[in-house]
Swiss-Prot record:
Entry protein name: Inorganic pyrophosphatase
Keyword Hydrolase: yes
Binding residues for substrate: 30, 44, 56, 142
Binding residue positions for Mg(2+) 2: 71
GO cellular component, one term: cytosol
Record-listed Mg(2+) 1 binding positions: 66, 71, 103
Entries under Pfam families matching the protein: Pyrophosphatase
Gene name per UniProt: ppa
Enzyme Commission number(s) of this protein: 3.6.1.1
Catalytic activity: diphosphate + H2O = 2 phosphate + H(+)
Chain segments annotated as transmembrane: none
Keywords recorded for this protein, A-Z: Cytoplasm, Hydrolase, Magnesium, Metal-binding
Enzyme class, UniProt record, top EC level: hydrolase
Length: 178
């Protein structure tokens, strides 16, 4: 099944659709969904023996400055199946850069209908410091043993910044569409 029919979300930027590529606590394998076919490809095996601290995916029909769809970290105590789509609310953004340039990660929680445990979270300051520390540690170190690769964390931004990034990424996608 191709994912081209999955929208960015019904009420963007307040609610977004996230296509899961990597489940929370999965082995150190980086998967990527092929946007045209929907097939899940192994991108690479991470050199560090680290597990992803949360579900990792992207928002369809978005395009960020790095040429990829908007990356999303879905905070949830359970792993989700790669290729599944989960409706979320953006609550913050991890500002970071790597050897390829700027590479922000939107932090999101599932909508209340999917998981009511995070219904109270509206902005980054309401996310547990434990979650934020785990996420920051993972992304600061997951490329440590890969030659020529590096990551620099540039801090956290709130929900308003995350929503601005999402709106800009949809506009960029639409302006680049044939």
């Amino acid at each position: 099944m191709g994912l081209e029919l999955v929208t960015s979300g019904k009420n963007l930027p307040e609610e977004i659709n996230v296509v899961i590529e990597i489940p929370k606590d999965s082995e150190p394998v980086k998967y990527e969904v092929d946007k045209a076919s929907g097939a899940i490809f192994v991108d690479r095996i991470l050199s560090t023996p680290m597990r992803y601290p949360c579900n990792y995916g992207y928002v369809p029909n978005t395009l960020c400055g790095d040429g990829d769809p908007a990356d999303v970290l879905v905070v949830l105590p359970l792993p989700l199946v790669p290729g599944s789509v989960v409706r979320c609310r953006p609550v913050g953004v991890l500002r970071m850069s790597d050897e390829a340039g700027s590479d922000e990660k939107i932090l999101a929680v599932p909508i209340e209908k999917i998981f009511s445990g995070y219904a109270h979270i509206e902005d980054i300051d309401q996310v547990s410091s434990h979650w934020m520390e785990r996420i920051g540690h993972f992304f600061e170190h997951y490329k440590d043993l890969e030659k020529g690769k590096w990551v620099k964390l540039d801090g956290w931004g709130g929900a308003a910044e995350a929503k601005r990034i999402l709106v800009e990424s949809v506009e960029r996608y639409n302006s680049d569409a044939p």
